């Protein structure tokens, strides 16, 4: 019988390091139809009259096994800073970089939240067909969808659907679901939403709860959480089930809305929905970024309600232990996984190898990498995507080259992406470009991920000109320019030391554009201004985030306070601002508040204060 207490038991303190999982959401649907001074402190154990309340003190139960380390995360108009860039300062060539496109891209984040739990493909645009004859890993084939192919070719959902109906073609649940699935894999969220909206307005298509959940997820991604909440009320009561609510919960995590996520979780309890491991995993992810003290409460809740950890839960725990450098604790979790009968697949093995490398245990990592390769690449070609970055991490260019040659002979989309990234880690830009070009030649319907993989290499090597040229190439190739592309450009300019131009590009992109930038895009600019002690611009970006409906959280306020600290400027009214935003400081934030307290007295001033 599994026990979360046993999983986390150890003599030392348990340090929950940040999870490697991004704050993102991925809809879980069936394939059949597919975060010492505080103002206030909450825990998570649920009770009906009070909702989420703390029932255990820091010394109760789980404190025997681990300690909890919380997350560390009106401008003066005269303080303009050095990074205010006038629009005319940009050259014509810079203005030529596309910042918008004809086809909306939607809010693009890493769509892989607890992916092993929700299902992940071993190749792009593939679906599971059947198990191999020897009873091994299921074989895959490319998901053929005429509707999807037509939409991508015409880049017009309305045109294709009108023609589709006129010709009397099938708009079955299976065809629509597969088209939505493939469009999601391309991050074409706006197109997915248009498809659902058109079906709802122009046909008698019978929507299932999973269909409504998919549409709600897309409304939140393309528009906002507020609009998603409005859409929720429009869903027929019979289809307003647990799947729909947990989809909204996942998007609250994506948007970093802690209070709203807790409200949704409580609402699901009030509606007497069973507490799912998916919902608990979402809260674990949320609190890993915003309030680590509550992580123990989630784990206690799972134990109290007999919710068995999923593979994704174990992934989270392994990442927490690994990032904290607790290799012994990580290995104890692995033992528990084995006791539970969960197979250590290549994905889990690659995560373990990654943390062995970080801990300097190169030989252990290499042993695991040999296990991952197993009987040979011909039998398990998909393991290249895990092995390539690992060999790059230990600087083994020979094995990276060996695997890259195999990838060339047996081109798979995911393996090619990993090869590009591996060569980037080794600073072999030309090799990465060569893999990219071969991928361009192979795929006619070319997703954005390879462009972003190559853009990341240009960013890390401060190759501004090449990065800009790549974005132009994306535009010329008909690739949708949207939030994810803006994010790549912003990172490129920030890394090159041009944060002012990065902000200007973002301002241009969002002008007259309904799509909003990603949370991480704003944070990249906010953090750079804060590092420079540019209070004015830091506050300006902070307000932009609020206007873009990104709720003020601990990490934003901590970054703003860092700007005041670096500028050696007192911050007036900061505590009141935080109270107004319902943000309560943890230990790290409280320390920063003390540093910028305008009424703080030094020891000498106290002596002379008579």
UniProtKB/Swiss-Prot annotation:
SUPFAM superfamilies: TPR-like. One of its GO terms (cellular component) is mitochondrion. InterPro entries: Pentatricopeptide_rpt (IPR002885), TPR-like_helical_dom_sf (IPR011990). GO terms for molecular function: mRNA binding. It comes from the Eukaryota. PPR repeats lie at residues 241-275, 276-309, 310-344, 345-379, 380-410, 412-442, 447-481, 482-517, 518-552. It is found in: Mitochondrion. Belongs to the PPR family. P subfamily. This is Pentatricopeptide repeat-containing protein At3g15590, mitochondrial. It comes from Arabidopsis thaliana.
